[in-house]
Swiss-Prot record:
Disulfide-linked positions: none
Protein name (Swiss-Prot/TrEMBL): Purine permease 3
Protein origin, superkingdom: Eukaryota
A single MF term (Gene Ontology): purine nucleoside transmembrane transporter activity
Species assigned in the record: Arabidopsis thaliana (Mouse-ear cress)
Function: May be involved in transport of purine derivatives during pollen germination and tube elongation.
UniProtKB keywords: Membrane, Transmembrane, Transmembrane helix, Transport
Domain EamA: 45-152
Similarity comment: Belongs to the purine permeases (TC 2.A.7.14) family.
Length: 351
């Protein structure tokens, strides 16, 4: 069951992680200028979470005895408060990321976000006491080096219509977004550990629902202050792809981004925050390739090398996990054999 959850969450995360930045950049490339609106779209798809929650509720209700009450939500106040806090932080982090995408090519933004893995490793070590293995360290180093290699000659990717100041500002703000999200992932894992209730995937979905609701509220407040509600009808009419496609892009953006967040927190539940971070980093070079295909961004040799290093890091990490699992099973078998031998030898010694 755990392996199935890991695979499902990896697929969902891959769709969101690769598709989210591309469709967000599509909005900005075709006349979109509202950063808070783009921020809102990152979490606005949260109502789709009610669908699996409804199935979970129906299943629990059928399994209960007749007359027993079944609550739709399982989350308790302690985990609820944690979800609210993480949701507010995510709202501001999403704004930082949207600001960066507004002024940077997808390839450059992907490179910066890849650097968050090093920060995730540090925060995970201090916040959730995540132990490092040689394979984990090797994966972190390879993925970080891959991100650094990807950074070579990024200045040539600067959009023509943007100033150097806008480019640098977008670069620095995206770095801040990477660091902040690197803090959020272990914070979610810590919330799971301190929940004082048995974590299930239903609880993970409820946590995600509240997180996205609060992040969306932060975005709506930002949209109101920035005047986005007044500006959006005009922006839709002037959208280069047409008014109808403006709303299509908005809807698909909300749905695809929801996949990213669901996959990320689902991996934290079934594995750890570090694994979630490694998976995000592995997918970034794939986003690079898609950006080259759809937006005709340059694919220098550095990007090819970065892709190879990232895949190497991915393989290194999972090989280490497989080896670690085999070692644990071997130790458990040896301990069980020793226990059996000691129990058999005890009557002889007593005689």
């Amino acid at each position: 069951m755990v392996k199935a959850l890991v695979i499902i969450n990896c697929i969902i995360l891959a769709i969101g992680n690769c598709g989210g930045p591309l469709i967000m950049r599509l909005y900005f490339n075709n006349g979109g200028k509202r950063i808070w609106f783009s921020t809102f779209l990152e979490t606005a798809g949260f109502p789709v979470i009610f669908i699996p929650l409804l199935f979970s509720y129906i299943t629990r209700r059928r399994s209960n005895n007749v007359g027993d009450s079944t609550s739709f939500f399982l989350i308790k106040p302690r985990l609820l408060i944690a979800a609210v806090i993480v949701g507010i932080l995510s709202g501001f982090d999403n704004y930082l990321y949207a600001y960066g995408i507004a002024y940077l090519p997808v390839s450059t933004a992907a490179l910066i976000i890849a650097s968050q893995l090093a920060f995730i490793a540090i925060f995970s070590f201090f916040m959730v006491k995540h132990k490092f293995t040689p394979f984990t360290i090797n994966a972190v180093v390879l993925l970080t080096v891959g991100a650094a290699v990807l950074g070579m000659h990024t200045e040539t990717d600067k959009p023509v219509h943007e100033t150097h100041k806008q480019y640098i500002t977008g670069f620095l703000i995206t770095v801040a977004a990477a660091v902040m999200y690197a803090f959020i992932l272990p914070l979610v894992e810590l919330a799971y550990q301190k929940a004082k209730q048995t974590m299930s995937y239903t609880l993970v979905l409820e946590f995600q629902l509240i997180l996205c609701l609060l992040a969306s509220i932060v975005s709506v407040i930002g949209m109101f202050i920035a005047g986005d509600f007044k500006a959006l009808p005009k922006e839709a009419r002037e959208f280069k792809l047409g008014e109808a496609l403006f709303y299509v892009v908005a809807v698909f953006s909300a749905i695809i981004w929801q996949g990213f967040f669901l996959g990320a927190i689902g991996l934290i539940f079934s594995t750890s925050s570090l694994v979630s971070g490694i998976m995000i980093s592995v997918l970034l070079p794939i986003t690079e390739v898609l950006a080259v295909i759809f937006y005709h961004e340059k694919f220098q040799a550095e990007k090819g090398l970065s892709l190879a290093l990232s895949l190497w890091g991915f393989v290194s990490y999972f090989y280490g996990e497989i080896k670690s699992g085999e070692d644990k099973r071997r130790i458990q078998q040896e301990e069980s054999q020793e226990t059996e031998q000691s129990s058999l030898s005890r009557p002889i010694s007593e005689c």
